[in-house]
Amino acid sequence: MVSVNSSHCFYNDSFKYTLYGCMFSMVFVLGLISNCVAIYIFICVLKVRNETTTYMINLAMSDLLFVFTLPFRIFYFTTRNWPFGDLLCKISVMLFYTNMYGSILFLTCISVDRFLAIVYPFKSKTLRTKRNAKIVCTGVWLTVIGGSAPAVFVQSTHSQGNNASEACFENFPEATWKTYLSRIVIFIEIVGFFIPLILNVTCSSMVLKTLTKPVTLSRSKINKTKVLKMIFVHLIIFCFCFVPYNINLILYSLVRTQTFVNCSVVAAVRTMYPITLCIAVSNCCFDPIVYYFTSDTIQNSIKMKNWSVRRSDFRFSEVHGAENFIQHNLQTLKSKIFDNESAA
């Protein structure tokens, strides 16, 4: 049992070790498979790549980089010891924030790109290019790495109590929260969450408004249904994965800086923190769903793959059937010849 003292409030948070171990194991398996398949499709299957594909490739790479660090986290939360050194601890922490806010920003890029394509299809042609998409992706990487870097400087391994085990990902001192981390939280919440949230909701609303205009009613009903599904899936995944954690992170920083001192509030916030963090980490498994609903090219490629497999199976069965038919006729002919020779 682990009891933590936050000023004068005592609470138990030992459940987080089991929770993290189980959740990270599941995310590692599902995230590794789904994102490897996604990158394979992007690189080896897709013949035509557009600006949306560029954003999705970068999102998949971000997810995969984080997934590769999960075995170290799983080992730590299972054994409660970090034997991998201070540098790997820092890298793991940095990749966590890089992945989370990189995912948020890349999903926002996809949302803005869809908004421009549907609301301003002609005016946005000069903006929606692969070259500009690569520039935007470079800007996103620089932003999330720059925003995550300060956390690396304050994160380090330390000994736990009287035993020889090393700790990583554990609580920072209140002094560190008051001097550094509270400012980092303000920056990443504004740049990495609230602005993207506003952009996602605004862009999705504008797209829905455009689709309901009389001018667009003549569009194919199937295409409009696809866009509506795309928006619905996109917003559900965004809100489910990122809203709980980022709202709780604000409250958590207020608790750690002792702005909130009520013990019931402190216990509730610190209990919800590992739960919302696990939900946020699950975005690695849900992002491939966004790829499928966002890109017609991916859907068509998967359908073509399935069709080619079925067609090859059909051709094989045809050839195999023809061979059996020929062999049967030959056997019948041989039998007749043998019977005639015997009769003679």
UniProtKB/Swiss-Prot annotation:
Annotated phenotype, changing residue 246 to D: Loss of G protein-coupled receptor signaling. Reduced localization to cell membrane. Decreased protein abundance. Increased protein degradation
Residues covalently joined to lipid (S-palmitoyl cysteine): 284
Principal place of residence: membrane
Outcome of swapping residue 63 to V: In ARWH1 and HYPT8; loss of G protein-coupled receptor signaling; reduced localization to cell membrane; decreased protein abundance; increased protein degradation
Effect of residue 248 to Y: In HYPT8; loss of G protein-coupled receptor signaling; no effect on localization to cell membrane; does not affect protein abundance
Effect of residue 277 to P: In HYPT8; loss of G protein-coupled receptor signaling; reduced localization to cell membrane; decreased protein abundance; increased protein degradation
GO cellular component terms given for this protein: intracellular membrane-bounded organelle; plasma membrane
Key words of the record: Cell membrane, Disease variant, Disulfide bond, G-protein coupled receptor, Glycoprotein, Hypotrichosis, Lipoprotein, Membrane, Palmitate, Receptor, Transducer, Transmembrane, Transmembrane helix
Compartments it resides in: Cell membrane
Extracellular-side positions: 1-19, 80-92, 155-181, 254-272
Consequence the record notes for mutating residue 196 to L: In HYPT8; uncertain significance
Domain of life: Eukaryota
GO MF annotation, one: lysophosphatidic acid receptor activity
Sites where a glycan is attached: 5
Cytoplasmic-side segments: 47-55, 113-133, 210-227, 293-344
Transmembrane domains' residue ranges: 20-46, 56-79, 93-112, 134-154, 182-209, 228-253, 273-292
Tissue specificity comment: Expressed ubiquitously, including in skin and hair follicle cells. Detected in both Henle's and Huxley's layers of the inner root sheath of the hair follicle and in suprabasal layers of the epidermis (at protein level). Expressed at low levels in peripheral blood leukocytes.
GO biological process, any: G protein-coupled receptor signaling pathway
Entry-linked Gene3D superfamilies: Rhodopsin 7-helix transmembrane proteins (1.20.1070.10)
Cystines in this chain: 89-168
Clinical note on disease: Woolly hair autosomal recessive 1 with or without hypotrichosis: A hair shaft disorder characterized by fine and tightly curled hair. Compared to normal curly hair that is observed in some populations, woolly hair grows slowly and stops growing after a few inches. Under light microscopy, woolly hair shows some structural anomalies, including trichorrhexis nodosa and tapered ends. Some individuals exhibit features of hypotrichosis. Hypotrichosis 8: A condition characterized by the presence of less than the normal amount of hair and abnormal hair follicles and shafts, which are thin and atrophic. The disorder affects the trunk and extremities as well as the scalp, and the eyebrows and eyelashes may also be involved, whereas beard, pubic, and axillary hairs are largely spared. In addition, patients can develop hyperkeratotic follicular papules, erythema, and pruritus in affected areas. In some patients with congenital hypotrichosis, monilethrix-like hairs showing elliptical nodes have been observed.
Family note: Belongs to the G-protein coupled receptor 1 family.
PANTHER family, A to Z: G-PROTEIN COUPLED RECEPTOR, LYSOPHOSPHATIDIC ACID RECEPTOR 6
Note: This is a nested gene within intron 17 of the retinoblastoma gene.
Name of the protein described by the UniProt record: Lysophosphatidic acid receptor 6
Source organism per UniProt: Homo sapiens (Human)
